């Protein structure tokens, strides 16, 4: 029996949940039929438990809707479908004891000694919230059981949300538990630079031996490998060697692995072998906690109402939040004035003005209305003519894409529409982008306008 019902179920779940939730928990699931039982396969126990707790009842409901009596039972367990054998022959690394003639000595050996870890980035200084709870929990599991818990661990999310902090925290924890461990943190561009240097100095075997001898390899911004075929080839073999030796790999990216254009499919597939978790923009309470925690680290007493004021106005990411706090502390230090809401408003005048221009549902509605030459009131109305329905659907889809609002909240902003109306709008926009080149161009133009 086919798994068509599961594919239909996935299509609806993708519309109902955020991209981060869908990509982290639902997209990695594989399905197969055993007589009249649908079996979902998850990459590890962590995913199994989370799906059971948060998504399973909805999955059962949708499967019953799409399959009728064809599927009698649904279960989820750890496992994976068989994967094709690697089609790349194993590499032979020439060692110093080889009978092959020695190459000329490198002009200058690459410095591999430092772990490049920032000792300030530890789990204790990472403020936990709903937006990063899962990523932090998974990171702590990896730190406690490197090479065993989730391998590789792939953390993705926007700029300044704490991915690098978690990566350093894992590395520091591994070294604390085992000072003899060989741990290396680096940006993906450093890996490329090391490889190029090794090629230039005829020391590629030394490069391979070093990277494949690590106990933990932590690579930041893996998306920069995109389009670099030789680097991807070398990393592919390094990845395989480390996993075969049960050594830990931790990767970060600004997007879900399957969405990294220019990355080989075999690499993207391997990125999903362990656990993929998202770090989302922090909610208000977490932003307040971050500000108070950072102020305490600087021996500054930050009034709660001031922290709340800053957190409410600066919503994009942790990095900008910390930057704003540093500016406030510096201004207070140089002027000798107490930190009050009025003082903060003056110290952050330009930054707050910029934040006020960030995308909101109201901004989206206004921009879409102007683009299509209709009134905002039309978008909020119940009118169903195509000239109004299309812009309304576009505005709803853009609101889901560009804001952190839930589907019910988006519906409320459009004249109290039901969340199912928003789901339908998002699905319709996705179809039109594929089938209508003019509509697709409109979507690109509006995304560019709203993102600039």
Curated annotation (Swiss-Prot):
The UniProt entry's GO CC annotations, sorted and at most eight, read: cytoplasm; plasma membrane
Question: Keyword set for this entry?
Answer: ATP-binding, Cytoplasm, DNA replication, DNA-binding, Lipid-binding, Nucleotide-binding
Annotated GO molecular function terms are: ATP binding; ATP hydrolysis activity; DNA replication origin binding; lipid binding
Which residues are ATP-binding?
Answer: 160, 162-164
Give the residue ranges for region: Domain II.
Answer: 85-115
Instruction: Tell me the segments the record calls region Domain I, interacts with DnaA modulators.
Output: 1-85
Region: Domain IV, binds dsDNA, residue numbers: 333-452
The Gene Ontology biological process terms listed for this entry are: DNA replication initiation; regulation of DNA replication
Give the protein's biological function.
Plays an essential role in the initiation and regulation of chromosomal replication. ATP-DnaA binds to the origin of replication (oriC) to initiate formation of the DNA replication initiation complex once per cell cycle. Binds the DnaA box (a 9 base pair repeat at the origin) and separates the double-stranded (ds)DNA. Forms a right-handed helical filament on oriC DNA; dsDNA binds to the exterior of the filament while single-stranded (ss)DNA is stabiized in the filament's interior.
Q: In the UniProt entry, what is the domain comment?
A: Domain I is involved in oligomerization and binding regulators, domain II is flexibile and of varying length in different bacteria, domain III forms the AAA+ region, while domain IV binds dsDNA.
HAMAP family reported for this sequence: DnaA_bact
Enumerate the PANTHER family for this protein.
CHROMOSOMAL REPLICATION INITIATOR PROTEIN DNAA
Oligomeric and partner information: Oligomerizes as a right-handed, spiral filament on DNA at oriC.
Q: State the family it belongs to.
A: Belongs to the DnaA family.
Q: What is this protein called?
A: Chromosomal replication initiator protein DnaA
